[in-house]
Amino acid sequence: MRQLLIAIPAMDEMNFLPQTLNSLLSEHVSSSLKVYICVNQPDIWWNEADKQEIVSANMDTIRYIENLHDDRVILLDYASKGKGWKEKKSGVGIARKMLMDSILKNADNDDIFLSMDADTIVEEGYLSAVENLFDHQEIKVLGVPYYHPLVQNEAQNRSMLRYEIYLRNYLIHLIKICSPYSFTALGSAIACRISACKLAGGFDSRQSGEDFYFLQRLAKSTNINLYLDKKVFPANRLSDRVPYGTGKAIENGVNGQLDKYPVFSPQVFEKVRETYMLIDDLYQQDIDTEMITFMKHHLCDENFLQPLRNNSTSKSQFRKAFHQKIDALRIFQFLRAEQAKMATTDEENLKTTIETYFPDVGEKSLLANLSFQHSSIATLNKIRNFMFQKEQQLRYNFDKNRQNGSI
């Protein structure tokens, strides 16, 4: 029987994990369901007075899991005294890696791996929808749709909505330029066949950003599908445990630190599209687009394309090699550099995006006097919902177009 293998890292998560587990274990699936939970912390925390609350919470989590007496739930204890991380390799990245390594020992290539977070609940029918998708299509990887819930805190909601709009704006642009790196990096929203996990090398042990680099490696080895009619609900909460990720982004937003998450203008993505359109020509000759010029300086190599040409015997081979070289990280670095040259505001860039791609937007009043700082939460939430709906349509069409070979 095929297995659904869910991986959840957990540190100080007793306030969230029971609800997450309930949403997963109450699902009716035809596959064998296993939920692996890695309760983790640096071992040195046992000796640090200011970490005792987290240490105690982790012990409570371990007891909670053990008391479930549910064969579907497998505990990985990297928190008890003497079992925690050595300081140099602590973090969610190593937790995800240990989860993946443990799962791979007991998995077949056609089993389905799902990356989750302890604070994320799933929409009813989510697991069966994933099953059906992987049953009826030759799909290797799925970037799962997501939606952050509102909470009873205006500043937190404002920051979350601003961040989610940033994420959706970014993916919408990537899909519009047909980038092979069209995905949103959320550790709670990834599903893939075990065969694809193996091909991509699994998670690495970065302190954070491990979901981005895992998806980037997956995108280099296979297509990432985007559409599912169910979604996951990552928690809307503050966190300073890692330097990146949703919790840190929301905390930064509450503190007014938004420079890491610019709402990109369509103009900067057009510069990527311009280069994409010339990839076949670049196989034959040098063409200095703005993106190519940036890469020459960024890579400290005026001739970075020549080895790609030398190792390619056709345009299609060169095209693949180009995308392997100019990957999701390089694209993001270029976009940030180009966006920094522009004097437009985040609000202006969002309005331009919506007016360019979705001129039929019904409530144009939403865009009038738009301000991430001052517009009402209701207004920002309507914009978020509008972008979610449009993104879902684009996800669906992107998958269909790639399936029939039109992109």
Where are these regions (language model features)?
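A recurrent flexible, glycine/aromatic-enriched loop bordering the glycosyltransferase active site
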Residues: L171-A191
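Acidic donor-binding/catalytic loop of UDP-sugar-dependent glycosyltransferases
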Residues: N109-D110, M116-L133
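A conserved hydrophobic helix/loop-capping motif in glycosyltransferases and polysaccharide synthases
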Residues: L4-F16, T20, E27, Y36-P42
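Catalytic donor-sugar/metal-binding loop of nucleotide-sugar-dependent glycosyltransferases
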Residues: R206, L218-F233
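Conserved donor NDP-sugar-binding/catalytic core segment of glycosyltransferases
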Residues: G125-L161
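Acidic donor-binding loop at a coil-to-helix junction in glycosyltransferase catalytic cores
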Residues: R206-Y213
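Terminal low-complexity segments of carbohydrate-biosynthetic enzymes
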Residues: N252-I407
